[in-house]
Amino acid sequence: MKNSESLKEFKKLNSDQITEKIGQLRKDLFELRFKQATRQLNETHKFKIIKKQVAQLLTLSKTQSASKTTSD
């Protein structure tokens, strides 16, 4: 999945789905760290991808909450 495609998909999510996705990605990141510590990880590039996705989702979450507070 390309980054632009994932960002487009993330923008379609509501705030509850974004929170759920952030939790899932953080869990995946924890599992990757555990695999790296036990030397079972071969795909180290996934760290960068997951961290970037978490940052994108957090940014979307902040902008959605900011737009809700300004519209209320």
Swiss-Prot record:
GO terms for molecular function: structural constituent of ribosome. InterPro entries: Ribosomal_protein_uL29, Ribosomal_uL29, Ribosomal_uL29_sf. One of its GO terms (biological process) is translation. This is Large ribosomal subunit protein uL29. Keywords: Ribonucleoprotein, Ribosomal protein. SUPFAM superfamilies: Ribosomal protein L29 (L29p). It comes from Prochlorococcus marinus (strain MIT 9301). It comes from the Bacteria. Pfam families: Ribosomal_L29. NCBIfam families: L29. GO terms for cellular component: cytosolic large ribosomal subunit. Belongs to the universal ribosomal protein uL29 family.
